[in-house]
Amino acid sequence: MTDQEEAKLILDKLNEKIRYHDLLYYTQDSPEISDAEYDDLCHQRSIILEKFPSLNSYYQDYIGGDPDSRFSKVKHNERMLSLDNAFNKQDVEKFMVRTRKLLDMKENESLCFSCELKIDGLSFSIIYKNGKLFQASTRGNGYFGENITNNVKTIENLPHTIQNAPDFLEVRGEVYIDRNDFIQLNNEGKNFANPRNAAAGSIRQLDPTITAQRKLKYCMYTIVNSNCLTQTESLNLLNSWGFCTNEHTISTDNFEEAINFYNKMYNNRSNISYDIDGIIYKINNIKLQHILGTTSKSPRWAIAYKFPAIEGKTKLNKISIQVGRTGVLTPIAELAPINIGGVVITRASLHNKSEIERKDIREGDYVIVKRAGDVIPQVVDVDKSLRTVELAEFNFPTACPACGSTVYQAQQEVSIYCMGGLFCHNQILEKIRHFVSKDAFNIIGLGKKQLLFFYEYGLITNIIDIFTLEEKINNKNIQLSSFNGWGEKSINNLLSAINNSKVINLENFIFSLGIRFVGKHIAKILANHFISYKNWYTEMLKLAQDVNYTINIQQVGLKTINSLRTFFIEQHNLNMINNLVEHLTIIDAQSNSYVSLIHGKTIVFTGELSSMSRSEAKLKSETAGAKVSSSLSKNTDFLIIGNNPGSKYKKAQSLNIQILSEDIWLQYIQPNKV
């Protein structure tokens, strides 16, 4: 595999993570990670795309998240872009140097910047027609936003009509909520994580009367396609029309003055009634903005210099251990409640055992808590001057607090892991979710909600239970159809999906076990190397039984080998695998000498097959070396038809694609050794 192919695999994973967190942040207003962690994901992607520019055309930059389906969509006349971020003074300087270079400016030519607060709220756009408010929308994914017109009309001091405005006017700004209003909102029984989420959730209410009660504020920052000469002039014009703009704005052509403005606002941020998370630097000259243009994601003429996280001091009452789905034991600080940036913090991450020892953190200490990215709190230091009595050192557990299994710490790693694997109930639900996922057993209809249901009723408490589910339901005389969400069709579909999944290829089986460092790519390498389940299992037992035994496979490193060894040392995992394979047919990986009549061909299925399910047919075809597609094209080699074929049959005839019956296809997939 080439470096670029490996980079593409990494980018696939990064994009999947980024889109997932975009959905949580922009659409559901419930982020799971900090701004800093999200920025790091985007930064990793930028580094790879910079190294492999040809991959840029393969990946479309999405902005934000897709519009909430509860609201009608609004197509933006011009894309609502996001901003590139700077995290230190050097990043800002690089931006300014790059900008001057793009503009082909001489050293003695001045370049003026507008310096504005980055308010932590929700971006929105308003269109006025003939001076009257016509439509308001969120940013959404940059192309389409959500129609929030009626909600925006409830915001105090926002003009519904404008005097002396052009016939068509689009302005953009930020909706936010003051910290005190946010605290009051939560005191009234709401449960927003922070002011930004409160503002975003309030503006997305289906009932505008609820929005009207939320004391939302706004700040306008741009006129789309403005005839103004400068950003400063645009802000003044917005003011003259009656819009709120931010008073904390300066323009300067001096780099140090721009940085001083950042430092001043960072130091005074607690005196501002609303949350800000950085300073935005914009080229002040609008003509130069147009010359610089944009990338697919952000303008080249602006950058956001992000603030570091907010900190506070409180007492650490207790250190508890949380066991994650990968088995990592994460120490958690149970804190005396502290309000940081308008959010009451009671728990914070201590990262790992090494961090506790390095910082000498003890129960009863007063600790410095930081909200990384203003979202996820973590303990960053201890105020030992307040340690007036002798406090006991914290002893990290030597057994998993959830299941009692042995814990281990790999060489050159800081994390400590539970060896319980699928025996550990804290890990089990997430492990099972991985087990049934698309790239593993691909059991459709067994998602998070369904798994939790079966787990709570004791029907699926380990992966073996999946394949005895029907028997358990019958033995316990449980009428699934009497429960909400379970109809006869959904039950039959699920049981059928489970039954079909019992035929699985070796690489998917290896991947399904969720062994650390064994992702899709490594699982495929292992499968292609060992060919059969028996060969693979035998070698894994050798690894577990002899610490000096190893396997030599290209791209399978020492970390992966040690992880495999650790997994197979644990008797719980061996018992699980041995019980599991009794329910399965594990298809050997295709060797290099394997050929069939459909090897290397692109095929499509239509109609209902009589001998097997569609998913099983897909697996058998792929094992025989074919590529299975869901749609016909001029590149399709064969269309396989079952009973009651659909419209693909006629389309295949019109495209002169060869059509095979199910019986002929079964002959074509037979392997031949050469």
Swiss-Prot record:
Its EC number is 6.5.1.2. Pfam families: BRCT, DNA_ligase_aden, DNA_ligase_OB, HHH_2, Nlig-Ia. PROSITE patterns: BRCT (PS50172), DNA_LIGASE_N1 (PS01055). Its cofactor is Mg(2+); Mn(2+). Transmembrane segments: none annotated. InterPro entries: BRCT_dom, BRCT_dom_sf, DisA/LigA_HHH, DNA_ligase, DNA_ligase_AS, DNAligase_adenylation, DNAligase_N, NA-bd_OB-fold. Residues 593-674 form the BRCT domain. The active site is at K118 (n6-amp-lysine intermediate). One of its GO terms (molecular function) is DNA ligase (NAD+) activity. Zn(2+) binds at C400, C403, C418, C424. The keyword Iron does not apply. NAD(+) binds at D35, A36, E37, Y38, D39, S82, L83, E116, R139, E174, K282, K306. GO terms for cellular component: cytosol. One of its GO terms (biological process) is DNA repair. It catalyses: NAD(+) + (deoxyribonucleotide)n-3'-hydroxyl + 5'-phospho-(deoxyribonucleotide)m = (deoxyribonucleotide)n+m + AMP + beta-nicotinamide D-nucleotide. Keywords: DNA damage, DNA repair, DNA replication, Ligase, Magnesium, Manganese, Metal-binding, NAD, Zinc. Belongs to the NAD-dependent DNA ligase family. LigA subfamily. HAMAP family: DNA_ligase_A. DNA ligase that catalyzes the formation of phosphodiester linkages between 5'-phosphoryl and 3'-hydroxyl groups in double-stranded DNA using NAD as a coenzyme and as the energy source for the reaction. It is essential for DNA replication and repair of damaged DNA. PANTHER family: CHROMOSOME TRANSMISSION FIDELITY FACTOR 18, DNA LIGASE. This is DNA ligase. It comes from Ehrlichia ruminantium (strain Welgevonden). The lineage of its organism: Bacteria, Pseudomonadati, Pseudomonadota, Alphaproteobacteria, Rickettsiales.
